[in-house]
Amino acid sequence: MPPTLRAMVKIQRLTGMRPGEIFGMRVGDIDRSRGNGLWYYIPGSYKTEKFVGKIKFPLGKPEQELLAPYLIGKKSGEAVFSPRTAQAERKAEKRANRQTKLTPAQVARDEARVEQPYRYSEFYNRFSYRQAIEHAINKGNKTLPEDEQIPYWTPYRLRNSAATATEEKIGLDEAQAQLGHKSANMTRRYSKAQLRIREKLARDRQKHNPFDDGLEGERAAK
C-alpha cells in the first residue's frame, strides 16, 4: 500500500472519520495554532454544518505524525492526500525494486508521463479511494498463502471499527460522539460535548497509539 493511502487508512481508523472527510481534507482545513498539543481538522464542507457550524476533529500525536509529511510545501486549498502523490510513490517503489536497467524506450515513456501532471486527479473520491484500497488488498494477497488472505473491506468498515473499539474501551456515548451520530436538533445541543469527548479520545491516543496493539485492517495498511 502506498504511504499516502496507508496514512489515510490509519487516520480514518483512529478517528472514525467518514471516507469523504479523509479524502476531502485540504491543507487549510488543519488548524495547528491552538497550543494545547492537539491539531484540529475543520472540514470546509459538512452535512450538519447548517446546524452547528464547522465540525472539529481533534488530532493527537499519531494522526499528526501521519499528516505532517503531507502538509509540507502545499498551499491552503491543496489536497492533503492526493492520487498524484500515491502514484509517484508507487512508481518510486517499482523503480527501487527493479532488477534490470531501464531501456531507452522505457525512460522516454516515463519522461512523457512526468510531463502530464494532471493525468491523475488531485483529490480522491469515494470510488477511487475504495478502488485503491481494493487494489492494495489484492496486491498483498498475491504474496500470502490462502489461509492468511486479507479479507476485502471498504472505507466505511474503518469508521465502524473505530466506533466499536471506542465503545468497548470507554462506552456507547463516546462512540456516538466520535462518529457524530445525532439528529439535527440533538447535534446542535450536544456539539460541544461531542468535541470534548473527541478531544479526550485524541489525548488518549497521545499517550498510547492504538496501532501499537495491532488494529484490524493494519495488515492491509502495510
What are these regions (language model features)?
Residues G28-G37, K142, P151-Y152, I170-S191, ...:
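Short, polar N-cap/turn motifs at the start of nucleic acid-interacting alpha helices
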Residues K47-H135:
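C-terminal catalytic core of Y-nucleophile DNA break-rejoin enzymes
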Residues M1-F23, G35, G73, Q87, ...:
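Basic, Lys/Arg- and aromatic-enriched nucleic-acid-binding interface segment
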Residues T85, R113, N185-R188, K200-K222:
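C-terminal secondary-structure termini that scaffold catalytic or DNA-interacting sites
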Residues S45-E49, Q87, L172, L179-D204:
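Catalytic-site neighborhood detector that most strongly recognizes the C-terminal catalytic loop/helix
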